[in-house]
């Protein structure tokens, strides 16, 4: 679990802050706290001196990027900006602050609420929004949050030079002026429309590889990490012809807590002992896989049937594949690189590609 926040700086005045880039590899993420619980006088000082993001930093960050779009003529007044989030902000304070930043910049905040990152970016393309913000700290624990940005029309992420410009703009803004600025932009709630678009997109046979015959004899455990897939995963999978068990789909239990991909980073194999009485003994998904695998162990050893797990991160844009090993009574963990290889091999076979 990592934080993208920069190292502390000793001075809290914006003029003396010379850090080049406050983002990490995919937006910015790290510990959060309310401004009143911080010892700093403004959100940038809290970020650079204490290594925490306050709700007012979220307002500053979205406002700054919207200003970038307006000044570069990538957006005009009242253009659409889509914003969604994972369920970690139980109070809603950080989400609401980010929405205010969009509106104070004079753009229309199109709120899609709790949805996985792919659904937010899909809706951005659908409505032709100038950009999309996703408020998430991915696989990091619930006391952290962050902001991802998707560029309009292309859905691309920011390049490092874009991050540097955005950092510079954040440092140049007088937050006291922003705090008192009026809400110039409009507010639109498109949660249901965005949800329907994503569900319809995923149900389209052109957008997935599922069929009734290729799931026969397969048991699937789906772990959504108490995250962004939680409100929609049951409906998304309701027509899948397989034995499916959904786990960790209750955000109240804590996003990424003993669930999802967070604690499986760098793990290739999990033994039964680690699940029965070891470090993974409290992990429902692994216990379910072990139980279902053992129930079918003899058959699994002598057939092509499988017990699989699909394990997501908090914002639903990353997945690991788990596979019960009936011979060693353990679980194989396959990360993104291996999944990409399998997908490429499938496409090569399906389309008879020679290279």
Model-derived regions: residue spans:
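An N-terminal, well-structured beta->alpha segment
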Residues: 2-98, 104-105, 185-220, 228
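Gly/Ser/Thr-enriched, mixed-charge loops and adjacent short helices
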Residues: 9-15, 31, 143-303
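Conserved active-site and cofactor/substrate-binding residues in soluble primary-metabolism enzymes
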Residues: 23, 52-60, 93, 97, ...
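Short, glycine-/Ser/Thr-/acidic-enriched flexible segments
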Residues: 28-30, 35, 88, 116, ...
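N-terminal small/polar loop signature for handling phosphorylated ligands or for N-terminal nucleophile
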Residues: 71-144, 235-321
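Short catalytic-loop micro-motif centered on adjacent basic/acidic residues
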Residues: 84, 109-111, 220-223, 355
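Proline/glycine-rich low-complexity loops and linkers
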Residues: 112-114, 168-198, 325-355
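Short beta-strand-to-turn element immediately C-terminal to the catalytic PLP-Schiff-base lysine
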Residues: 149-152, 320-324
């Amino acid at each position: 679990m990592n934080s993208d926040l920069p190292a502390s700086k000793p001075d809290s005045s914006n003029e003396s802050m010379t850090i080049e880039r406050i983002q990490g590899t995919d937006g910015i993420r790290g510990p959060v706290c309310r401004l009143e619980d911080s010892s700093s006088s403004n959100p940038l000082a809290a970020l650079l001196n204490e290594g925490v993001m306050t709700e007012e930093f979220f307002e500053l960050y979205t406002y700054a990027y919207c200003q970038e779009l307006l000044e570069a003529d990538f957006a005009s007044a009242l253009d659409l900006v889509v914003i969604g989030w994972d369920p970690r902000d139980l109070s809603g304070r950080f989400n609401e602050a980010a929405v205010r930043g969009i509106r104070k910049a004079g753009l229309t905040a199109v709120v899609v609420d709790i949805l996985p990152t792919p659904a937010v970016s899909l809706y951005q393309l659908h409505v032709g929004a100038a950009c999309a913000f996703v408020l998430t700290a991915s696989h990091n624990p619930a006391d952290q949050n962050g902001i991802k940005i998707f560029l309009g029309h292309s859905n691309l992420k920011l390049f490092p030079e874009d991050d540097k410009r955005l950092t510079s703009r954040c440092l140049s803004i007088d937050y006291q002026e922003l705090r008192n600025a009026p809400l110039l932009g409009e507010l639109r709630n498109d949660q249901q429309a965005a949800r329907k678009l994503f569900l319809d997109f995923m149900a389209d046979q052109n957008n997935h590889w599922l069929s009734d015959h290729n799931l026969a004899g397969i048991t699937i455990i789906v772990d959504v990490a108490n995250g962004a897939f939680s409100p929609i995963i049951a409906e998304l999978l309701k027509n899948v012809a397989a034995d499916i068990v959904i786990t960790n789909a209750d955000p109240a239990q804590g996003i990424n807590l003993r669930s999802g991909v967070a604690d499986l980073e760098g793990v290739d194999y999990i033994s039964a002992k680690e699940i029965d009485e070891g470090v993974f003994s409290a992990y429902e998904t692994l216990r379910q896989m072990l139980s279902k695998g053992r129930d079918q162990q003899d058959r699994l050893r002598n057939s092509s049937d499988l017990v699989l797990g699909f394990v997501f991160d908090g914002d639903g844009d990353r997945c690991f594949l788990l596979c019960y090993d009936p011979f060693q009574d353990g679980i194989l963990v396959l990360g993104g690189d291996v999944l990409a290889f399998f997908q490429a091999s499938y496409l090569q076979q399906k389309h008879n590609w020679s290279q």
